[in-house]
């Protein structure tokens, strides 16, 4: 008997709050509504929460984190069900390479790691790893393991897939003159060699065509990858981010990509951990409407229900979506450090 899907719902940012930013209203803060903090963190997603966690680890507490929603988490938000929680969006974390020391430190703090392998590789505890098969594709009424559909593939499809995989292996092994990988997490450790950065000037689709790939199955596979991670198809995403998807999680050629750490609530487990450490510094339902650079630092103006509040700060960490920066940061449109106005935002449906 056909099973009826449960009714769904859309959760996330409040439209009415977003309209306040778009309308670019001016707000006057009453004199008795100003506070002073050395640092204000704007945004309570993983970026803002991890920044707050880092400050606390450095024994720095003179900061405030401002989140516009009633709950923190952003795109790592989760819900509470019976008997277990569930993710609304981001739901796994690839086990990091040993060089990613900050992230390894966090995972150790959360007791998610088992230890090290013979080559120093990070080993996560089995109970926190995604069960096999990690990935499946649904085709003509059946599930098949993996994301590339081997069933029904022609000899030419298989040949092109093998050629594509060889290119990926070559990039995984590639190092620049200083020993840096082309694609790795964190991004700060990626090579800036022109051979690598030039890949950001063409689309992934064009790169595939330039390499002579014509297999529809291979194009579907690559298109799925960019849609999955970036919300863009292969002709919208750059070749750099396309190759990053396939290379950054592979320790060395010939081995499988890193396993996934996951929990019932997805990446909500990290949200809960961070929040437990910094909850006294968090202000929920505070929508930041203006960030104004001053001679002494930065003034941050926000709405708290019907109240207008302000914070005199030395510095701010802007951990909100980048497309909002031109609407919030005073002068950002005039001296923008990057093309923030060109950012497009896609909703994340699960």
Annotated model-derived regions:
Residues 53, 75-78, 104, 147-149, ...:
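Short, solvent-exposed loop/turn and secondary-structure capping segments
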Residues 88-97, 189-197, 256-263, 337-344:
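Active-site rim elements
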Residues 84-173:
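Dinucleotide-binding Rossmann-like beta1-alpha1 core, especially the glycine-rich loop
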Residues 56-82:
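Glycine-rich FAD pyrophosphate-binding loop
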Residues 176-297, 312, 329:
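Active-site/ligand-binding neighborhood in enzyme catalytic cores
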Residues 1-39, 57-58:
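Extreme N-terminal leader/targeting segments of oxidoreductases
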Residues 34-65:
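N-terminal Rossmann-like FAD-binding beta1-loop-alpha1 element of flavoenzymes
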Residues 286-350:
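Central helical "cap/lid" subdomain
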